[in-house]
């Protein structure tokens, strides 16, 4: 059966406005000419002129966080425990079966920035697209932030998934979710306002912290979700295997059978 692949990852670039200033990625590019000098140093007697076109290798040196670019967060990122007291798993311990499964897209692009999605809103959207959640479905949330990646207000855009909305998914067997926003939760300034008004610390990172009850992973900084149908595709999002890490980068892809 013919298949179509849709890239749902964002591009990692030096200085791309994808994170707070202290977290912006930095990439140094070593061109072929510099690579020729390095290659000559590795092989005594070699000169760059002896190499085809005087070129050596091209290499990049990168200074980034595991939370730059499109990445999969492990339960360890949110807390030291999951599943009501078990040790939270790190990214190298995430079951691979979680990372390749049928995908579902929830369209919340209409919701205002800072809105905290409820379980009732998830139910309404699932009813609209005619889908009943199945165990291990990968649920992707398309927000208003997706269209703003690389803009100076990206980290402030989009709705967030609240605790009850997250648990609604997890209680039905979902173990990987994703968003095209900077965070699975609402942007920090909106949460800060709610905390200031209530003094309720449980509102801070409430979607992330749902993993303390039922462990799960989520993808952040996805892209191109508007190109996906609501159902009928498979998501591949295997993370880079970093020992004991809280997250790993992924080239997330949606696979459609046609």
Question: Which residues are covered by each model-predicted region?
Answer:
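Active-/binding-site microenvironments in catalytic and ligand-binding cores
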Residues: 1-258
């Amino acid at each position: 059966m013919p298949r179509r692949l849709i890239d749902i990852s964002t591009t990692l670039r030096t200085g791309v406005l994808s994170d707070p200033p202290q977290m912006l990625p930095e990439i140094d590019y070593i061109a072929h000419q510099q690579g020729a000098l390095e290659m000559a140093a590795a092989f005594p007697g070699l000169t760059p002129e002896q190499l085809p076109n005087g070129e050596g290798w091209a290499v990049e040196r990168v200074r980034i966080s595991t939370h730059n670019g499109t990445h999969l967060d492990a339960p360890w990122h949110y807390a030291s425990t999951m599943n009501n007291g078990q040790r939270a798993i790190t990214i190298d311990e995430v079951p691979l079966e979680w990372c390749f499964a049928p995908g579902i897209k929830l369209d919340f692009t209409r919701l205002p920035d800072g809105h905290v999605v409820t379980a009732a809103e998830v139910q309404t959207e699932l009813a609209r697209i005619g889908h009943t959640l199945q165990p291990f479905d990968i649920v992707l949330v398309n927000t208003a932030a997706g269209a703003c990646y690389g803009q100076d207000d990206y980290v402030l855009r989009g709705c967030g998934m609240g605790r009850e909305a997250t648990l609604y998914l997890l209680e039905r067997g979902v173990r990987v979710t994703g968003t095209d926003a900077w965070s699975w939760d609402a942007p920090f300034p909106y949460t800060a306002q709610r905390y200031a008004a209530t003094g309720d610390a449980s509102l801070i990172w409430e979607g992330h912290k749902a993993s303390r009850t039922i462990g799960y992973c989520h993808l952040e900084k996805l892209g191109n979700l508007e190109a996906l149908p609501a159902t009928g595709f498979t998501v591949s999002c295997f993370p880079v295997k970093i020992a004991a890490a809280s997250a790993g980068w992924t080239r997330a892809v949606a696979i459609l059978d046609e």
